[in-house]
Design a protein with these regions (language model features):
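C-terminal and inter-domain tail/linker signature
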Residues: 1-126
């Protein structure tokens, strides 16, 4: 049986994204997922689309710390890219219910992350 522990699920989610492994994401993310970052709110489809857009620049995620309390987990990790941004420190606050992530809040330095978006836009324009 799959773990329903928030810490384990959060760790698995960040690892799957960093490995560009979308298959486990379907089971880890609840259909009613709400994801928030940079003033935007996305549903599961929108979140997966956003992740797919970033994956060409993502080399890996390096998890630094995972904290959990009940159904909540906090993952601090470096989003390591092949862009001039290099590694960008990120924090994701996750809520898990019935073994699936129902809420994500992503915190990051938008200035440090800007080169990632700029270089992805340049690649798409080619």
């Amino acid at each position: 049986m799959a773990s329903t522990d928030a810490r384990t699920i959060a760790h698995s989610y960040i690892q799957a994204v960093g490995a560009h492994d979308e298959k486990p994401l379907e089971g880890l993310l609840d259909d009613a997922l709400i994801a928030q970052f940079a003033g935007a709110t996305l549903d599961k489809t929108g979140w997966l689309t956003a992740l797919r857009r970033l994956m060409p620049a993502l080399v890996r995620n390096e998890i630094r710390e995972v904290f959990s309390d009940g159904d909540r987990a906090c993952v601090i990790y470096d989003f390591v890219t092949d862009t001039s941004a290099g590694a960008v420190r990120c924090v994701e606050l996750l809520t898990v219910r019935d073994g699936r992530i129902v809420h994500i809040e992503l915190l990051l330095d938008r200035v440090a992350f800007a080169p990632v978006n700029e270089e992805l836009a340049e690649r798409a324009a080619r």
